[in-house]
Design a protein with these regions (language model features):
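N-terminal cap/leader regions of alpha/beta-hydrolase-fold enzymes
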Residues: 1-128
């Protein structure tokens, strides 16, 4: 699918020094920022489409690749549920929060956090 907004992969650095990739889409005239937290399947085409949708509505958006803690560029098919759950179980909530915080810090003030599936649970933790 082609999008009007330019996207790119960037590198974030968490407070513990860990570097992770993140999918980034910039709005033309941003009104705020959003961190989109992935599903158990990684930064899928669906998550990238969600980022583009938010950017087309005026938000700078970053989706941190939180599985980079143990393997880079993990993107699973939606049929690979068991593998996705396995990756989720390997990642501690503390490390996930550190990576989400790195995305929030990169975007700055006026930043919201939203997640889908596993990301929804992490969004709840990030808000508490």
């Amino acid at each position: 699918m082609e999008y009007l907004m330019k996207s790119e992969w960037i590198r974030l650095k968490a407070k513990d020094g860990h570097e992770l990739d993140a999918f980034s889409v910039k709005a033309d005239d941003p009104i705020g920022n959003i961190v989109v937290i992935q599903e158990i399947f990684g930064i899928t085409d669906h998550i990238q489409a969600v980022c583009h949708k938010f950017a087309s509505n005026g938000y700078d958006v970053i989706a941190p690749a939180i599985y980079d803690r143990f393997e880079r560029n993990i993107t699973l098919d939606y049929t690979q549920i068991e593998e996705g759950v396995g990756y989720k179980m390997k990642l501690s909530d503390d490390y996930a929060m550190s990576d989400i915080d790195a995305a929030h810090t990169y975007l700055g003030s006026k930043t919201a956090v939203i997640g889908y599936c596993y990301g929804g649970m992490l969004t709840h933790i990030a808000a508490s």
